[in-house]
């Protein structure tokens, strides 16, 4: 059986490869809460042909390249919900929100692709940390209400 140290070294090598292979996106794949978020941002940027903002920019993670320059917030999760900053912590919600879930096999599923306003109108009560949660089940339900014209078009999956 490999030691924790051996496993961590493997993980750090993977992180180094991710950062090298996706350097154009200027993301750090740190082994903390940012890892899934950074991976999700890169997946979504490539799937929807988006320009990513600097890492850790508040609320806005990317902009569309289609000439409309819409703002996009990207969320990735491995659990059954995602968190958003509560309404009083930002000036304007993003034009679009894309939420994906990533399973342990590394496959991702699109959970929501649509207007930011619809998400922010349906968030739960803010927690003490200023974050509001929404379940993936609720996101899937909201997604059914989003017309194709209000979704970002897939470039590739």
Regions found by a protein language model. Give the residues of each.
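Nucleic-acid endonuclease domains
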Residues: 1-157
């Amino acid at each position: 059986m490999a030691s924790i140290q051996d496993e961590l070294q493997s993980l750090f090598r993977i992180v180094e490869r991710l950062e090298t292979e996706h350097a154009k996106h200027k993301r750090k794949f740190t082994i903390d809460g940012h890892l899934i978020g950074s991976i999700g941002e890169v997946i979504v940027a490539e799937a929807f042909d988006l320009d990513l903002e600097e890492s850790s920019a508040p609320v806005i993670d990317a902009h569309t390249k289609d000439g409309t320059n819409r703002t996009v917030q990207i969320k990735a999760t491995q659990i059954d919900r995602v968190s958003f900053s509560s309404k009083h912590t930002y000036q304007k919600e993003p034009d679009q929100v894309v939420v994906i879930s990533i399973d342990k096999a590394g496959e991702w599923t699109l959970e929501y692709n649509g207007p930011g306003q619809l998400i922010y109108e349906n968030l739960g009560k803010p927690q003490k940390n200023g974050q509001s949660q929404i379940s993936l089940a609720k996101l899937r339900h909201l997604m059914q209400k989003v017309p194709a014209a209000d979704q970002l078009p897939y470039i590739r999956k």
